[in-house]
Amino acid sequence: QREELAKASQEFEPIHTLDYSNARIVFQGLEGAYSQLAMEQFFGENCNNFHVESWKDAMEAIKNGEADYAVLPIENSSAGIVSENYDLLVEYDNYIVGEQIIRIDHALLGLEDADERDIRTVYSHKQSLMQCSEFLDSHADWEKFSVSNNAVAAKKVKEDGEISQAAIASAKNAQIYGLKVLRNSIQNNKNNSTRFIVVTGKKVYTDQADRISICFEINHESGALYHALSHFIYNGLNMTNI
């Protein structure tokens, strides 16, 4: 096992910085998605990018050579890990080369002539619905529906044109899709944030890297997990998540 680990580590090439001057970046959702905001903060607002419908589509884009990097949410300070993307990291031979943490500030968006009292149905991503559970619980009569992305929810409300519909998304989506902010900062935690990862198909790491994510399987027997985790202790490594 040690020989296999040593061989695997040698396959990764150390680099000084990521070269994304001519790179194509993919994010999930539509214009106004939080993934787009994370992408722009990491790569710059003028980066060459495109969007896809699902996180799996983003990983496929790297696999097929359509994109050099993908930006995916991996953990929220309120709702916890995004388990679907952990599964995708196992499924695809794509590797984490960076991260971007952004503040998540959810707003309730409706049509221009709508009032909060008109709302009967709310659309958003399931993670956002969880992050705004306290506000939504105070409106128990509202129906809640999850969609693939916050920006998708905002676009749907605009296109449907129903005064009783609202979306939970960033306030930026009100400007993009011609909606009105009915209420700002409706998330449970006012310091709500999400950690996004930047993944690529290349086995590289920068010399500033100080964190590693690994996935492994162990036998279903007594002490197996203990013996695996003991290597972290003996090598002076600190675990931040398991």
Region locations from a protein language model:
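Domain-level signature for soluble enzymes in the chorismate/prephenate branch of the shikimate pathway
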Residues: 1-242
